[in-house]
Curated annotation (Swiss-Prot):
Organism: Rattus norvegicus
All copies of domain CARD, residue ranges: 1122-1211
Enzyme class: hydrolase
Gene: Nlrp1a
InterPro entries in the cross-refs: CARD, CARD8/ASC/NALP1_CARD, DEATH-like_dom_sf, FIIND_dom, Leu-rich_rpt, LRR_dom_sf, NACHT_NTPase, NLRP_HD2
Protein name: NACHT, LRR and PYD domains-containing protein 1a allele 3
Amino acid sequence: MGESQSKQESNTRVAQHGSQQDVDPTFQTKRALERERSSPQVEQSFLGQLQSLLGWSSTSKDVPLSQLIREMDHESRRHSHQSKKKLDRSEHISEGTIPEIYEKRKETISHTQSMEQKYLFQNFTKLLLLQKCCPGGSEKLVRESWHPCVPEEGGHMIEIQDLFDPNLDTEKKPQLVIIEGAAGIGKSTLARQVKRAWDEGQLYRDRFQHVFFFSCRELAQCKQLSLAELIAQGQEVPTAPTRQILSRPEKLLFILDGIDEPAWVLEDQNPELCVHWSQAQPVHTLLGSLLGKSILPEASLMLTARTTALQKLVPSLGQPHRVEVLGFSEFERKDYFYKYFAKERNTIIDFNLIGSIPVLLTLCEVPWVCWLLCTCLEKQMQQGEVLSLTSQTTTALCLKYLSLTIPGQHLSTQLRTLCSLAAEGICQRRTLFSKSDLCKQGLAEDAIATFLKIGVLQRQPSSLSYSFAHLCLQEFFAAMSYILEDSEEAHGDMGNDRTVETLVERYGRQNLFEAPTVRFLLGLLNTREMREMENIFACKFPWETKLKLLQSIIGEPFCQPCHLGLFHCLYENQEEELLTETMLCFPLTASGPNHMEATVFQTNVKRLVIQTDMELMVVTFCITFSHVRSLRLKGKGQQEYKLTAPAMVLYRWTPISEASWKVLFSNLKCTRNLEELDLSGNPLSYSAVRSLCTALRQPGCRLKTLWLVDCGLTSRCCSFLASMLSAHSRLAELDLRLNDLGDNGVRQLCEGLRNPACNLSILRLDQASLSEQVITELRALETKNPKLFISSTWMSHMTMPTENTDGEESLTSSKQQQQQSGDKHMEPLGTDDDFWGPSGPVSTEVVDRERNLYRVRLPMAGSYHCPSTGLHFVVTRAVTIEIGFCAWSQFLHETPLQHSHMVAGPLFDIKAEHGAVTAVCLPHFVSLQEGKVDSSLFHVAHFQDHGMVLETPARVEPHFAVLENPSFSPMGVLLRMIPAVGHFIPITSITLIYYRLYLEDITFHLYLVPNDCTIRKAIDEEELKFQFVRINKPPPVDALYVGSRYIVSSSKEVEILPKELELCYRSPRESQLFSEIYVGNIGSGINLQLTDKKYMNLIWEALLKPGDLRPALPRMASAPKDAPALLHFVDQHREQLVARVTSVDPLLDKLHGLVLSEEDYETVRAEATNQDKMRKLFRGSRSWSWDCKDHFYQALKETHPHLIMDLLEKSGGVSVRL
């Protein structure tokens, strides 16, 4: 029984991982070497060194080694058995059947080696897959390196079983799936996994009856094929007659691996001229007809290609599913190492963590590099060397591989020949070579055997052709060939020019720096790597070769500034002089027909989409050599600060690994010009914060401003932050808001702030949850250190509408209103929050703003309604009711309701005297007018001390559910879900528009959310933190559906990020989705629109006029009643402003024409010092109107924001009139 169970486990694991022969092209060589090892102790020693080198620690979670070996043996026997299956020649074969074509095909072309060839990467469980958006067809299939406008959305992560899932917009299953990605990232591996999983009955069996796998590099060897012959090639053994297979074309899947490799043009033939399936035609025409749907239009296709090759490959690909392979996750990198080195049957070693070489681990995101690294380590072990790898680039790793595998310098001549073969193949887009090709090139028989043995070359199973172990390896050898050619004196400058021309002709000007050959070439021109090449080839390279080639490539006029591909090339080169010269000579504002200048808040702010850890590493590495002063890594729900130009914003849709954080922060140790870093919205682990603070302590780090808003920091992280502040860091501004630091964490920060070496001048953190003792400690620190300004999101200066003595509406700070009300714990809310009853409005008071707790005193029996919250109370007598705003997330996530019910309205915590309330109407946002929702599905959830209770309301009205004789606890409306309906529930929604003026630019935030007062309040508070003001515009008239997507557009040319909004419910405590709209000049106004993405019908529009916009000014503090007159903010702080305004001329420029005449402007400017200029300005201000002083205040706020914020915090409010 044990043996049976073992076999069963083996079969299961093999289905997931594949065989060792699939893993490695040098499998047989490895087995021979294993037999040559002297003892198991050698292996044990090696594994111990490996564990030490890579920083792994042991766990008990991985599969035992013995089991893995059994799986490998089983899979090897299974493939051996399959390969021996032959057709019975005595079987009767009719014309056009699969067996006949199968046998005929064997005589003309080698069998497709999709399942038997010794590939590199079949021993991993899964790859990171990003399903991308493809709006409007396939006009732009290639992801641009620079995005003047960031894509509407970055897509979402999927699994292999989701490749053919229905399109979210059309609900149609795709017929074409494009697997794209960088070189060596695992595209072919994924395609083979699909075929293998289907063969073994694990994937897509319900959708496809036949799956055919084709290697396009092998198909390209054929001149002509019929459709029947093509189908025969796609099967390991014949399964059914051709006619029977073609009778259900909708059940067929054709997998075309490496569609971009051959040098062909796939042309669709005229549908009227389509030939019979048994008639041969040129291969490229046959494939072009498949792609163009001229033949088998109902069939499905899966293509794999490098991303850069897609656009010119096929003119039109309809509406494909585009899936980008992003390589290994950090866990899968570790898993790959485990499987690669799991060889000794009696040794069980579980590797859990890779941490000591973050750059190498980031490089290993690419599966091919993983294999390369493992091979190098294994070669070192075989040669008895101490395990050590210091390679920082893929190029250096390839050279290390060569130095470890090439047996001595006597092969240097043959190695040159192999390089020439590789270069010729790259130019001709050939990856398969016949024996005669190798001999014609000058490769000797013994050299070919050696290259096969060491794994540089591999023989195809048919023995008819050879190839490099991987296309990337061929490209590396081609790059070496160009170095060898250009080093010959006979070529001189002409050789350099010819090399560049050859590369441009092969890859195109736009994609030159995306080509691995070019990246390897730049890497080989590194001083250290050229010395390594000299050792390998036993020759000397003139240094002029290096300089001239670099100049030829980087100095070309088509070299695009700040191109992601160029960043990769510069990273491979690693030469500081080249990096500095290149990065500093390119402006950040791109120009030209393909590069529109991108303006965020200003010019010189560029956006770049990065998808992988590798891309993040190379970009941040190059940035440290540039003139970029501000860097933002865009996080989810992140509010943006104004960045100092030149700046760069990086967008990423996938999680960042721990190794990648370490590399990023390591690059900050010497930042040159980088002074601002915004990581807000990105979750930072304990170890990531430690790496960050270590970098900030380095003398070469010049960062002055660090934003860590909403990064998931805890008190545990504060010890590192405090240590960094105490270590002579240059950091002057630190924002830690929306992090749960707690009293203990803030106390640790205070220790760092007290250190005389601390240079911090601005600290922003939340104080609402802090104890009075800690807040007092912070204030004492400010008093002791006048240069330190501690800002808070504590709303002590929140303002509310009141009536001034003239009967006009003014604004009063909540702090002063508390004093005027006679209750220091209460604040009156505005009239929108009043309860309207029999005697008119009843004001609502704030009990605790931070806890969202309010109170209303209803004076008599009757019905009361609050328009703002939607709450109704029917009371029998005077009663005081307390109302708290809650978040569903804190109650629902531990109950089964989250799977069976959807939130249908806000959640309130209501407290009232028992028996005083006879009915309560709880608001909901489900639209009943559509007639699609049964009112019996509504429930009111009570969250009580003893558990949760669902209660059926007495009745359900269009906007609320009525609960009679209620008992109170946290309560709200839920809707029971019906599986057939899913989430397609019509709801009432609202649009919220906020704006902020900065200089001449206007930034709008547009939200589309359910009509939930708690969400609206949370958004209001969040926007207020960043001084955005809400504009009231009508909501959508019709009901909308949760999960639907809407396109945001404008009547003018504006920048909208993202261009789509999804209507979804998010808890008030979560970040809400919004579109950010940048407007340089609003002119007479702009028209904003929301259009249903699926049906393209207009669902909402609003006209924003200049009159809708008012400066985003803080609120005004009321003067005491006995005050003779209300002083404006600028008059209240005249002394401070005269003493502390350090730059008057920009202030005067803003007032010129609005407040100051030409004569006044020149008179003030003529004063000798800033203080004299300010005194002269204030003397003239005595005759200014209140509006003129408002302009003065706004100009001060724009030119001296920190000063104004400091004065606001200390005064508790601002006296301005809107």
